[in-house]
C-alpha cells in the first residue's frame, strides 16, 4: 500500500525479478509503474502501467517472447481517485498456472505464468525514480522542488506447495 506525488518526471514502481544478473534470462513483473505528470498544467495522470517482461527468452519458433502490457484506467474501474492522491493497494499473485495483478482488490490483468516464474523465486523491489532513462523533463516546483513516496505496508505470502528448481535460503 503506497502513495507518491505525481510531478512531471516522477516514476514510482513496485515490481519483481527472478534474477538481478543481466546475463541470465529472467522475468520482470511490473505490478505498478506510474509516470508522474503529463505537463506542467496537468500533473496527475489517471492511470498506471503493468508490464511483464521475459528478458532474453524465446518462443519455440525462435522469436523473442512478447511481453504483456496494460494501461490501468483507475477511474474506469471504479477507483475513487488517481494513483497519486490517497493510498492504494497493488497486488500480484503468481501461481503455477496464472499470474494475476490487482488494484485496490480489483483484478486488472491475468496471464499464463511464465516458466521461469514457475521455476525461480521472485524478489520484489519498490522504488521512486526521478527522471528515468528516457530523459523525461523533471518539474518538482509544485511540490517545493522535492517529491516523496510513502509506503504504508508490504505483505508477501507464499504457497506451501510451490517447489523451485533452485534451493531457497534456509529459515533461521
Model-derived features with residue positions:
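GH16 jelly-roll
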Residues: 1-172
Amino acid at each position: 500500500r503506497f502513495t507518491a506525488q505525481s510531478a512531471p518526471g516522477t516514476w514510482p514502481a513496485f515490481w519483481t525479478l527472478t534474477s538481478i544478473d543481466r546475463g541470465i534470462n529472467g522475468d520482470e513483473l511490473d505490478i505498478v509503474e506510474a509516470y508522474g505528470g503529463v505537463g506542467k498544467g496537468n500533473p496527475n495522470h489517471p492511470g498506471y502501467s503493468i508490464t511483464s517482461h521475459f528478458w532474453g527468452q524465446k518462443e519455440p519458433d525462435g522469436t523473442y517472447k512478447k511481453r504483456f502490457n496494460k494501461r490501468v484506467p483507475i477511474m474506469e474501474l471504479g477507483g475513487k481517485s488517481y494513483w497519486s492522491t490517497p493510498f492504494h493497494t497493488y497486488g500480484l499473485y503468481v501461481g503455477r498456472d496464472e499470474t494475476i495483478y490487482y488494484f485496490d482488490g480489483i483484478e486488472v490483468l491475468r496471464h499464463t505464468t511464465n516458466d521461469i516464474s514457475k521455476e525461480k523465486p521472485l524478489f520484489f523491489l519498490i522504488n521512486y525514480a526521478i527522471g528515468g532513462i528516457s530523459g523525461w523533463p523533471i518539474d518538482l516546483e509544485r511540490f517545493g522542488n522535492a517529491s516523496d513516496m510513502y509506503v504504508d505496508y508490504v505483505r508477501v505470502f507464499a504457497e506451501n506447495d510451490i517447489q523451485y528448481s533452485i534451493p531457497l535460503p534456509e529459515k533461521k
